[in-house]
UniProtKB/Swiss-Prot annotation:
Residues 220-311, 358-383 are annotated as: Disordered. PANTHER family: BOX A-BINDING FACTOR-RELATED (PTHR10071:SF281), TRANSCRIPTION FACTOR GATA FAMILY MEMBER (PTHR10071). This is Transcriptional regulatory protein GAT1. The keyword Zinc-finger applies. GO terms for cellular component: cytoplasm; nucleus. It is found in: Nucleus. A zinc finger (GATA-type) spans 310-334. It comes from Saccharomyces cerevisiae (strain ATCC 204508 / S288c) (Baker's yeast). Present with 1180 molecules/cell in log phase SD medium. One of its GO terms (biological process) is positive regulation of transcription by RNA polymerase II. It comes from the Eukaryota. The modification Phosphothreonine is found at T369. PROSITE patterns: GATA_ZN_FINGER_1, GATA_ZN_FINGER_2.
Length: 510
């Protein structure tokens, strides 16, 4: 109190600074003690005994300093890895015990012990005590042992070891069922205790693993019950084996086993699936081959079953049997008639001869020779296709009977162009045109012949037979001068006394 007394009555900055230094020294001393304790605890060599629970010690060591340490996540990951390493050491020890027990059970010494030793019921108490102890230890440590806190590089290795351990555990369960049948006649006490301890180690490991289902744990209890039951019958052994098989089949639902399943569980199913997948293309090939054979073989003219008769026409020869709406058999003709017309086929249309359809006319067959049909020739299909296409084209052309239109190249053109005849000179009767209509020379002199007009007139008024007539294309230059009119009265060539042109040379078939 004498240190704080001057502060209350005579405050001064010197005393205030001194008190501050004292408080700082006390704080540094306290923190130094905590750091020393931490360093001493870290300098201790950890005991890697697999029976010790190191994750609890590491957790207690770093839980207080987790918030102030920069690499707290890495330390947490390291703690989980150390714990997993110890758990795998424990698993290896369990597997060694189980293998030694299996070797002993297969030896002739074990059969002699089973034949001589009396029954022993001391396993019940040890099993129940060990189970209660391990269950209490599980409640303290927690069941979330294998969480996803591993590094990404080690995930595949961990999954592989889990699947291997799981398959080994299932094999150990089978050996435990065999061991139960041996215990029916009796084992020595030291062997029974070792068997129970190793079997209980299996029990705690299966409870701690999250990738094992509850079905496997229940099956493990059934193994314990068969282990404790001392009936000498062989039926218990078979029941235990069936229980292990059911546990092996139910454990395939776990996610880790889906990623990397054990070979003892998934191989039969995978073989079955592969065989089914291989059978599918084989079935497709069989179907395709049968379809090719059915298409290659022509349909028979008669039915395979002569006892069947048509319910309408009572015939027994038909290329195809059909059915009416009531389910009665119909021949091909009656069935098609009913399908197309909706009524039954009259008996007056019945014929005993099956007519074949004429797919091409006789003219086309005479003109075009079909190629030789050979099923062995690979190019026969292409030739047959070309043949049918040519037959169809020629048949279509003959049925339409189309006359191609006349082109300008097909029309005979005169060497000397002649003018077209005016409308008032045309007549429907054959006669000599005289001086009934006066025509001046200027009409023809100013007129220029147009080839298009000439062809149009000829096509419109004359038939095609008149094109070959010499009088139709008689030249007009002898009577008409296209350049200048002849007004000389002394020239009487093709003129009348009145001075009109005489058109007697026009012998047109108009």
């Amino acid at each position: 109190m004498h240190v704080f007394f001057p502060l209350l009555f005579r405050p001064s900055p010197v005393l205030f600074i001194a008190c501050a230094y004292i408080y700082i020294d006390i704080y540094i001393h306290c923190t130094r003690c905590t750091v020393v304790n931490i360093t001493m605890s870290t300098n201790r060599v950890p005991n890697l005994d697999p029976d010790l629970n190191l994750n609890k010690e590491i957790w207690d060591l770093y839980s207080s300093a987790q918030k102030i340490l920069p690499d707290s996540n890495r330390i947490l990951n390291l703690s989980w890895r150390l714990h997993n390493r110890t758990s795998f050491h424990r698993i290896n020890r369990i597997m060694q015990h189980s293998n030694s027990i299996m070797d002993f059970s297969a030896s002739p010494f074990a059969s002699g012990v089973n034949a001589a030793g009396p029954g022993n019921n001391d396993l019940d108490d040890t099993d129940t005590d060990n189970q209660q102890f391990f269950l209490s230890d599980m409640n303290l440590n927690g069941s979330s042992v294998f969480e996803n806190v591993f590094d990404d590089d080690d995930d595949d290795d961990d999954v592989e070891t889990h699947s291997i351990v799981h398959s080994d555990l299932l094999n150990d369960m089978d050996s435990a069922s065999q061991r139960a049948s041996h215990n029916a006649s009796g084992f020595p006490n030291f062997l029974d205790t070792s068997c129970s301890s190793s079997f209980d180690d299996h029990f705690i490991f299966t409870n701690n693993l999250p990738f094992l289902n509850n079905n496997s744990i229940n099956n493990n209890h059934s193994h314990n019950s068969s282990h404790n039951n001392n009936s000498p019958s062989i039926a218990n052994n078979t029941n235990a084996n069936t229980n292990t098989n059911t546990s092996a089949s139910t454990n395939t639902n776990s996610p880790l086993l889906r990623r990397n399943p054990s070979p003892s569980i998934v191989k039969p199913g995978s073989r079955r699936n592969s065989s089914v997948r291989k059978k599918k293309p084989a079935l497709k090939k069989i179907k395709s081959s049968t379809s090719v054979q059915s298409s290659a073989t022509p349909p028979s003219n008669t039915s395979s079953n002569p006892d069947i008769k048509c319910s309408n026409c009572t015939t027994s020869t038909t290329p195809l049997w059909r059915k009416d709406p009531k389910g009665l058999p119909l021949c091909n003709a009656c069935g098609l008639f009913l399908k197309l017309h909706g009524v039954t086929r009259p008996l007056s249309l019945k014929t005993d001869i099956i007519k074949k359809r004429q797919r091409s006319s006789t003219k086309i067959n005479n003109n075009i020779t079909p190629p030789p049909s050979s099923s062995l020739n690979p190019g026969a299909a292409g030739k047959k296709k070309n043949y049918t296409a040519s037959v169809a084209a020629s048949k279509r052309k003959n049925s339409l009977n189309i006359v191609a239109p006349l082109k300008s190249q097909d029309i005979p053109i005169p060497k000397i162009a002649s003018p077209s005849i005016p409308q008032y000179l045309r007549s429907n009767t054959r006669h000599h045109l005289s001086s009934s209509v006066p025509i001046e020379a200027e009409t023809f002199s100013s007129f220029r012949p147009d080839m298009n007009m000439t062809m149009n007139m000829n096509l419109h008024n004359a038939s095609t037979s008149s094109f070959n007539n010499e009088a139709f294309w008689k030249p007009l230059d002898s009577a008409i001068d296209h350049h200048s009119g002849d007004t000389n009265p002394n020239s009487n060539m093709n003129t009348t006394p009145n001075g009109n042109l005489s058109l007697d040379w026009l012998n047109l078939n108009l």
